[in-house]
């Protein structure tokens, strides 16, 4: 990914052997790719409080924070109605079943950008399940991708890491993003090439922008991809060991990371 060629020092004969082996591997094995797409919903306020949603690339740090999204004891969350409505719109556009009952749960883990020590997310009862979309790669191949689920959750804060010599580096945290509404769209592992993954991600972005629920501006981090990549023998229905590639914020990164893996 960095552009460094780890095989440059090998003699031509060994390179030819490696290239032959790669071709044989491609004939015998296929890639299996599933994706998780995190999309910030376009609401005026956060998921569980009245704090405004601000552009974290320009806003003064830690100015859109309250006891709820700051994780102070005793603060009670109240769900954002518009975020729920937007999540339902996306579910319908993805041919999902909209569940009559949905619930939130605490996803417990420790990280400095998570002030409560848990993330409010949906686990057992997501708002939308069992959908699908059809996409087309550049070579005209149609690919039907299943949508396992789409669920709502809150975004984390944003960390800024500063390196310094002598171990004097430090990290600053901006909580303006903490609590911003997110919709996580989880696909089935139905893609078998980086081209198919690109077509799927592009289609999801188009749908979100058409519905007006997300700007699609990946430079601002409002749309982030995670690719789950494995390989298996061609014809096998058993999934291989999965590698999860997180926080891909561009189509180019998605394609290069998937191809590399």
PLM region descriptions:
Residues 11-14:
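Short Gly/Ser/Thr- and charged-rich N-terminal loops/segments
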Residues 16-18:
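Short terminal hydrophobic/aromatic SLiMs and anchors at protein ends
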Residues 20, 24-261:
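Basic, nucleic-acid-interacting segments
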């Amino acid at each position: 990914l960095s552009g460094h060629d780890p095989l440059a020092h090998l003699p031509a004969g060994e390179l030819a052997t490696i290239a032959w082996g790669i071709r044989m591997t491609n004939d015998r094995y296929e890639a299996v790719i599933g994706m998780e797409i995190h999309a910030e919903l376009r609401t005026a306020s956060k998921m569980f409080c009245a704090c405004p949603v601000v552009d974290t690339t320009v806003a003064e740090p830690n100015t859109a924070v309250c006891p709820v999204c700051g994780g102070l004891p005793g603060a009670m969350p109240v769900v954002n109605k518009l975020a729920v409505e937007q999540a339902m719109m996306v579910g319908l556009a993805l041919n999902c079943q909209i569940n009559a009952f949905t619930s939130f749960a605490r996803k417990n883990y420790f990280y400095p950008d998570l002030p409560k020590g848990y993330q409010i997310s949906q686990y057992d009862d997501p708002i939308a399940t069992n959908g699908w979309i059809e996409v087309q790669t550049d070579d005209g191949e149609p690919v039907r991708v299943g949508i396992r689920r789409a669920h709502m959750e809150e975004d984390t804060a944003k960390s800024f890491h500063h390196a310094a010599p002598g171990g004097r580096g430090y990290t600053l945290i901006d909580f303006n993003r903490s609590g911003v509404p997110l919709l996580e769209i989880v696909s089935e592992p139905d893609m078998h090439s980086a081209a198919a993954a690109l077509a799927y991600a592009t289609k999801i972005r188009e749908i979100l922008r058409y519905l007006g629920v997300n700007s699609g501006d990946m430079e601002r981090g409002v749309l982030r991809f995670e690719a789950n990549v494995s390989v298996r023998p061609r014809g096998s229905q058993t999934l291989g060991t999965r590698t999860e590639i997180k926080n891909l914020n561009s189509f180019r990164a998605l394609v290069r990371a998937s191809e590399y893996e």
